[in-house]
Amino acid sequence: MDRQISVPIKKEDALSLRAGDYVTLTGTIYTARDAAHKRMQEALDAGESLPIEMQGNVIYYMGPSPAREGRPIGSAGPTTASRMDNYAPKLLDLGLGAMIGKGKRSQAVIDAIVRNGSVYFAAIGGAGALLSQRIKKSEVVAYDDLGTEAIRKLEVEDFPVVVVIDSQGNNLYETAIKEYQK
């Protein structure tokens, strides 16, 4: 099923998505990679607030290349999501609506997705230049000292993703293999 979803994502939208759905996202998403996740965890451990609101928001695991003149961002392909698996359950418990990355997730992350009615999307690896064309604005909003791993606020329009793990725990990486083996 092809769906158009506004982000931040509404709970009813997240709950209605199924593994394998093709989705385009329009609105605001945030980027964060390993170093930013580590710093957010340190802030939480110290009893500090996070630099971005989690409720309903979407984090894209991505660190862009430098922007060409006249563009808001350079190549913007996904990074391997499993590197954030130690941090994702806590952020999901704080209300994170969805994550975008590539690759498999740990069982702890899948359990947190189900527990919180969230979703994990995949973006196409190797298509960063094409994906960047769907990013209309980019602004560093936290951890500027981390360079490419700083947290960015992105305005996206018709940003293409696929639901890999839905709010019921259905996992496209597992079901696709079973379907192929028939």
For the regions a language model picked out, list residue spans one by one:
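Feature captures the catalytic cores and cofactor-binding loops of soluble hydro-lyases/lyases
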Residues: T31-A32, A36-F159
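Short, structured beta-strand/loop micro-motifs enriched in basic residues and often containing a Trp
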Residues: M1-I9
